[in-house]
């Protein structure tokens, strides 16, 4: 009975069967460089609906019930989205994302500092008792 409920790996798909099905119209793989959605490469994935046992795509859990499907991509059975938690460590895209986050952080910190200085300057220029 346990073998009946065990999840199997989803069907291979895409060019050279280098991807895995994530839904009836989604085929993804690191070797594919991303995902095919609703294309000829996903036709085989529709067969999953007719197989008696459920499958679970590989990859770490991500997003809302999805799994990491390719570098920086999280997919559920219905959709795919960019997800930084799916970036492979050390990949060029992971390094770019880290740099962008650092830049955003630096920009926010700079904006905050500038705003605080402006507020401090206004406070110094005011006379006591005036609003």
UniProtKB/Swiss-Prot annotation:
Location in the cell reads: Secreted
Q: Name one GO cellular component term.
A: secretory granule
InterPro entries the UniProt entry points to = Neurhyp_horm (IPR000981), Neurhyp_horm_dom_sf (IPR036387)
Listed A to Z, the keywords are: Cleavage on pair of basic residues, Disulfide bond, Secreted
Q: Which domain of life is it from?
A: Eukaryota
- Report the record's disulfide bonds: 10-55, 13-27, 21-45, 28-35, 62-74, 68-86, 75-80
Give the protein name, as stated in the record.
Neurophysin 2
Species name for this entry?
Answer: Anser anser anser
